[in-house]
Amino acid sequence: MSVIDKVYYVEHVDRFRVDASKVMSGIKNIASSDGFGIPVLVPQDPGQAGKTQVRAYVQDFAGYTIKTNPVSGSKTVRATPFSSQVQGGNVKLLRGPWNDAYLSELESFDGSGAGHDDQVDASSDAFNELALGINSTGMLEYYRQEAEKLREERKAG
């Protein structure tokens, strides 16, 4: 996704349904295609599993800029800013074979958790990062925050 003169362009969407063990390699292939100058935004689920996943991405994607995005709020709340811009005509798609599946998923999204919503999540996260710069930290900032948490835990315990 990119932005030019307050218009947001969804340039390409890679959609794949694979085992969890193959998700990271699929994302790494996309990152390799995008190049080192494009940051990789990784949503961080709450709890230890989310932290472990982020660490794995940071380690495996050496050389890339990794930005973590702590997930908070419902999917509907996170999707609202993107949805508003879509409804306002400020989001454009580049033509591609992925358009129909992408639009179908966005149109069927109701926030209930039923059905597929990964493309909604990815679009919302990318939009929120570009438009608002919210809830993301670069790799160095992530590790600084983790070190600070450890210091606080040691003081308390």
Can you name each region flagged by the protein language model?
Residues 2-112:
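Mg2+-dependent endonuclease catalytic cores in nucleic-acid-processing enzymes, primarily RNase H-like
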Residues 117:
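Conserved catalytic/ligand-binding micro-motifs in nucleotide and anionic cofactor chemistry
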